[in-house]
From Swiss-Prot:
Function: Catalyzes the isomerization between 2-isopropylmalate and 3-isopropylmalate, via the formation of 2-isopropylmaleate.
Protein known as: 3-isopropylmalate dehydratase small subunit
Gene Ontology cellular component list: 3-isopropylmalate dehydratase complex
Transmembrane portions of the chain: none
Pfam families: Aconitase_C
Taxonomic lineage: Bacteria, Pseudomonadati, Pseudomonadota, Gammaproteobacteria, Lysobacterales
Gene name linked to the record: leuD
Keywords: Amino-acid biosynthesis, Branched-chain amino acid biosynthesis, Leucine biosynthesis, Lyase
Catalytic activity: (2R,3S)-3-isopropylmalate = (2S)-2-isopropylmalate
Coiled coil (UniProt feature): none
HAMAP family membership: LeuD_type1
Length: 215
């Protein structure tokens, strides 16, 4: 998992509340358990004017010119600005996979659905909760300023606007540690690889009959 320390990126404003996981990545794309291939279908039913299907060449599909991520000014955005209850609906890890693969490193909103919030940390996507008034101010600046960027400093737990105004945000210390060091569940386990190896050796020595079929 890519570490997240400090990131400055172009902001895309998704001015919709209660965006659910089926809107983030529609159900027909959930057949795969691989973590790749979902970025092109992020917000599929909003980005395109037709119905998407797995394996289809998206480069030939008609784009929805009224959807924010299709606006030229937001191409290459890596910070998603959203409204309350982002990521609600069914539990699907594919949602943060799609956001991450599209290029978003962080999502800023007044609130998130609990399961989406937890899944985001496990996949290297930083969900930041700010006060609604602060999010409103960011929307206003983003919508009126082309090329609007924000800087997110995870170590300092601050979001800095182009005018120098900063907002602090809370994050669990363990989740912060994992993101700063690029540790997912597998990475955390591998930190104890030596201890696991010693246990396996001792276990095999104490109960060799359990491993007979593996000889």
């Amino acid at each position: 998992m890519t570490p997240f320390t400090r990131h400055t990126g172009l902001v895309a404003p998704l001015d919709r509340a209660n965006v659910d996981t089926d809107q983030i990545i529609p159900k027909q794309f959930l057949k795969s358990i691989k973590r790749t291939g979902f970025g092109p279908n992020l917000f599929d039913e909003w980005r395109y004017l037709d119905i998407g299907e797995p394996g289809r060449d998206n480069s030939t599909r008609p784009l929805n010119p009224e959807f924010v991520l299709n606006f030229p000014r937001y191409q290459g955005a890596s910070v998603l600005l959203a409204r309350e209850n982002f990521g609600c609906g069914s539990s699907r890890e594919h949602a943060p996979w799609a956001l991450d693969e599209y290029g978003f490193r962080t999502v800023i909103a007044p609130s998130f659905a609990d399961i989406f919030y937890n899944n985001s940390f496990k996949n290297g996507l930083l969900p930041i909760v700010l006060a609604e008034a602060q999010v409103d101010a960011l929307f206003e600046q983003c919508l009126t300023t082309e090329g609007y960027q924000l800087t997110v400093d995870l170590a300092a737990q601050r979001v800095r606007r182009p005018d120098g105004v900063e907002y602090g945000f809370d994050i669990d210390a363990f989740r912060k540690h994992c993101l700063l060091n690029g540790l997912d569940d597998i990475g955390l386990t591998l930190q104890d690889a030596d201890a696991i190896g010693r246990f396996e050796q001792g276990h095999r020595a104490r109960q060799p009959w359990l491993f007979g079929a593996l000889q």
